[in-house]
């Protein structure tokens, strides 16, 4: 059996693949051995004596299955961990994500006129100062602030109404007293006139 090293090299060059991927027909070795140019190799490829082997399957099914399991939290216990908690999920990244979420919420609330710019600024600084652990707590805080503001406004309005009411009542009382005084003075003056 002759060595077909040259033919294999030429075939790999023509087929544009590695020498491992070239299949030479073992029943037609003599004919293949006679081919010593690229043109002849091309003819043999056309005839089917030289074939490019298909790509070996490297399945990712198991890998996909494991990835899905890891998303559920499987294979992620203490025994599987190599790095520190900070190496696996950096605190800085967690902080940045939280800041972006909370600041986005504040911006959205300000744009939709749910909070005014003064409240926005004070809450922004509180967010920066690590007051709110997550979005839910910030939203609850905003609702509470708004409720307190509304309650204060209501109480102020009620107090104002009460003040204006007492003012009106005092004014009416003074007017009545004044009218009574005038009446008494009139009657007294009439009596004095009749006596004379």
From Swiss-Prot:
Disulfide bonds: none annotated. Keywords: Citrullination, Cytoplasm, Isopeptide bond, Phosphoprotein, Ribonucleoprotein, Ribosomal protein, Ubl conjugation. The modification Phosphothreonine is found at residue 187. One of its GO terms (molecular function) is RNA binding. Pfam families: Ribosomal_L19e, Ribosomal_L19e_C. GO terms for biological process: cytoplasmic translation; translation. The modification Phosphoserine is found at residues 13, 164. The modification Citrulline is found at residues 5, 16, 38. InterPro entries: 60S_ribosomal_eL19_sf, Ribosomal_eL19, Ribosomal_eL19_CS, Ribosomal_eL19_dom, Ribosomal_eL19_dom1, Ribosomal_eL19_euk. There is a cross-link at residue 181 (Glycyl lysine isopeptide (Lys-Gly) (interchain with G-Cter in SUMO1)). Citrullinated by PADI4. Residues 157-176 are annotated as: Disordered. It is found in: Cytoplasm. One of its GO terms (cellular component) is cytosolic large ribosomal subunit. CDD domains: Ribosomal_L19e_E. The keyword Amino-acid biosynthesis does not apply. Residues 159-176 have a biased composition (Basic and acidic residues). Component of the large ribosomal subunit. Belongs to the eukaryotic ribosomal protein eL19 family. Component of the large ribosomal subunit. The ribosome is a large ribonucleoprotein complex responsible for the synthesis of proteins in the cell. HAMAP family: Ribosomal_eL19. This is Large ribosomal subunit protein eL19. It comes from Homo sapiens. The lineage of its organism: Eukaryota, Metazoa, Chordata, Craniata, Vertebrata.
